């Protein structure tokens, strides 16, 4: 289990890209079983992953979370997306996931990345739930006898990105590495 804080997300995922570049170089990428990303997570109501491969495991962990606190709805969402620190991992086929489904508190949305952003916009209970429910996910993954999600091959990664309509945005960003 490794906890990492990345810098430079807003400047182009600088920290996570650097991490993945080094992990490819030293082959440690092969040891990464899951990259759980927590960006704009508040009072999550369920878990998410890039693919459905670990849906049953995530729902089992979520069921335990829900039995402790019924505000956790134990929803599951799968899909590939861009523009957060999971992206460099996903582009290398590493399973990614996290939690979500909550909403930003205190009308914080308009202040995201704006001058009006302020610590008073943070909701303490939502932050506590973020930590609790995500700690349950991390513990559940670490304690699982098996994790169905495996690192995707290069072709499987390409297919996932095509299915998710991410080729064009990745081409625009200069990050589509496959030859057609």
Question: Whereabouts are the PLM-identified features?
Answer:
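His/Asp/Glu-rich mid-to-C-terminal helical/loop segments that flank catalytic regions of hydrolases
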Residues: 1-2, 107-180
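Metal-dependent peptidase/peptidase-like ectodomains
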Residues: 6-109, 175-178
